[in-house]
Amino acid sequence: MDDKFDDDALPNSKTTAKDYEDKLPEYDYTTTFPNTWMRLREPFREYFAEFVGVAVLIIFGVGADCQVVLSANTGVASSPKGSYLSLNCGWAIGTAMGVWISGGISGGHINPAVTLAMATWRGFPWWKVPGFIFAQLLGGIVGAGLVYVNYIHAIDIVEGGRHIRTLDTAGLFATYAADYMTNLSCFFSEFLATAVLIIVIHAMNDKRNTPPPAGIVPFVLFFLILGIGASLGMETGYAINPARDLGPRMLTAMVGYGRQVFAFRNQYWIWCPVLAPFLGAQVGTIFYDLFFYKGQDNVFGRLGSHIHISPA
């Protein structure tokens, strides 16, 4: 591309600012790197987008958890600063903003269960899966760390000191099921909520269904997460995202909560907020593909398609 201006591009008494800007050379940033930094960052943009997307999700979501719960203590605030509705709004807004930031770059998975489902059933490259999941998990750790630093003094007041850390405040960062829940019911709750999540995601991405207009997806996800929280969130805290739970859980283990965050209910952390969402996303995708999806990448649509019966 020739980056020199011709005579007509030079400003004169009859040239307006807009005319001059219109004649400036245009660079195709999708194929041309104007500097070394642009070239070096290109292979990592998708992973960094997932990292930031999850970090933003956690900042809004865990931040809302902390504000609602910690402000209920009179030593922290004179009156409560929120409710269960505002808590759900925090997670819904966090999801919407996280997808808005990362959607045009990485696809806006911000959830390992979604990434694995897309790789299994929608042709997402398998070689990207480990990097995506690592970036998502790291985003969960960093996002939770930022919220922890922001609310550390309020946590100290609620706990009774800087070096006292119990599951009461650990629950602000990761999910811990209600005492009355059985192990099976905990697993089913996360499985069901994640299946609903992925079914709606596939419906939004299905061009033969009713996909939302460009740029509207984050708003749809806002109402989706708000609805899941309002209907299925009370019993387990609706992790529905392994990075959302495991990242902050690892952060709490590192800042003083110790092994108790992993020992809760016989390693609850792995089979409920991690394995259940992975399985729920897979089964939810199978359900959508079996009964609704007509895309060429539908595995069930290809079964037996090579068989042709000729008339006698």
From Swiss-Prot:
- Keywords tagged on the record: Glycoprotein, Membrane, Repeat, Transmembrane, Transmembrane helix, Transport
Alphabetical list of Gene3D superfamilies matching this protein: Glycerol uptake facilitator protein
* Bilayer topology term: Multi-pass membrane protein
InterPro entries in UniProt: Aquaporin-like, MIP, MIP/Aquaporin, MIP_CS
Which ranges does the record list as Extracellular topological domains? 72-89, 150-183, 235-267
**Induction of the gene:** Expression is high in vegetative mycelia and highly up-regulated during development of the basidiocarp. Expression is positively correlated with root abscisic acid (ABA) content during ectomycorrhizal interaction with poplar trees.
Q: Where is this motif: NPA 1?
A: 111-113
Report one GO cellular component. plasma membrane
Per the UniProt record, one Pfam family is MIP
Enumerate the subcellular locations listed in this protein's record, separating them with semicolons: Membrane
Q: Which residues lie on this side of the membrane: Cytoplasmic?
A: 1-50, 111-128, 205-213, 289-312
The reaction(s) this protein catalyses: H2O(in) = H2O(out)
Protein origin, superkingdom: Eukaryota
| Segments passing through the bilayer | 51-71, 90-110, 129-149, 184-204, 214-234, 268-288
Carbohydrate-modified residues: 183
Q: Which GO terms describe its molecular function?
A: glycerol channel activity; water channel activity
Where mainly found? membrane
Family to which the UniProt record says this protein belongs: Belongs to the MIP/aquaporin (TC 1.A.8) family.
The role this protein plays is: Water channel required to facilitate the transport of water across membranes. Does not mediate the transport carbon dioxide nor nitric oxide across the membrane. Plays a key role in root water transport of mycorrhizal plant such ectomycorrhizal white spruce or trembling aspen via the hydration at the hyphal-root interphase. Contributes in fungal cellular processes during the basidiocarp formation.
In the record's own words, the domains note is: Aquaporins contain two tandem repeats each containing three membrane-spanning domains and a pore-forming loop with the signature motif Asn-Pro-Ala (NPA).
Q: Which NCBIfam families match?
A: MIP
Q: What is this protein called?
A: Aquaporin-6
Source organism of the structure: Laccaria bicolor (Bicoloured deceiver)
